[in-house]
Amino acid sequence: MPQFKRLLTALTVTVATAAGTATWAQAADTELNLYSYRQPFLIQPLLDAFTKETGIKVNTVFAKKGMLEKIKAAGDNSPADAVLTVDIGRLYALKEAGVLQAVKSDVLEKNIPAHFRDPEGLWFGLTTRARMALVSKERVKPGELTSYEDLADPKFKGRICVRSGKNAYNVALIASMIAHHGEEGAEKWLQGVKANLARKPQGNDRAQAKAVYEGVCDIAITNNYYMGKMMTNDDKPEQKKWAAAVRVTYLNQNDRGNHMNVSGAAVTKSAKNKEAAVKLLEFLSGDAAQKIYAEDNQEYPVKPGVPYSKLVQSWGDFKGDTLSLEKIAKLRPAASRLVDKVGFDEGPGS
């Protein structure tokens, strides 16, 4: 996909070095200001479609780091009307910081299942992603790995690769294990997974698939869309080889379902253009935007009935865990403590 360069027209940014803040020009009623953690090339087609349908212009600032800090520092003077980010942990952190406001919308409640949105209407999931296994086609038989619990089975000793346990996606997964098995059970499980690691946790999700391709390990734990990105990466064709070496394996299909996380959005407490911000969230939860999400990023639409991309469909149907993301978010601190307690990131044998 071509990279895009966002021109912030009708938007003035003055950097105050001493204060570390930014002052934006007041937006008109037909505009809104968006802080986005999500990459520009992904969200631009969605925002263009929104503007075309509503006439509302979206002024976007890509803020992969420090989004919460910027909003908190500006307080009521924050120019942000809405935020777009990934992972339940980041959404919940915004909620806990008190920088969001509740939204009551029949459209959002209809489009987004209850377990993928905040019970108070403070944040809304817009896409879902599965934390699944990519297993070696050559060295792992179909049906050999069927659950997260299996990852702690001694038969997989020296065969698992994963990134840091402190990564947001892994913390959410561990939190879900606490929800299902209690903290003591989750700790025992995490110790078992650690014992089965082929190497010290490192790299990103794609690096784990590469390790399977290279024979370092047999099982990689990743988010589903990384498989899609590798399969279609014409700029880095070596990643297609990594993807070709592995088989998508959804976990816990015979019971609760595969662990799920979200990307999502919220309206800020300081929003000067709340009505426009709510319209954006409603649009992003609708059929047209959900289809763009599915086709462009190989994520799962949060709205029931919107089809997955053909590539994702080729991996087969699956059942996702319906555990409340609010519950997962509340258990994240305990999950992070477990990572430290068992010394997960120190690797096997430590």
What is each residue range found by the language model?
Residues 35-38, 119, 135-137, 143, ...:
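Short beta-strand->loop
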Residues 158-165, 283-307:
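Periplasmic-binding protein-like
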Residues 101, 138-146, 178-187, 271-277:
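Short helix-loop capping/hinge motifs at secondary-structure junctions, enriched
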Residues 132-139, 260-273, 292:
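A bilobed periplasmic-binding-protein/Venus flytrap-type ligand-binding module shared by bacterial periplasmic
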Residues 321-350:
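Conserved C-terminal helix/tail region of periplasmic/extracytoplasmic solute-binding proteins
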Residues 27-92:
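Early extracytoplasmic/lumenal segment of secretory-pathway proteins
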Residues 176, 181-251:
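Ligand-binding pocket segment of bilobal, Venus flytrap-like solute-binding proteins
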Residues 78-83, 101-135, 149, 159-162:
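A structural signal for short loop-to-beta-strand junctions that line the ligand-binding cleft
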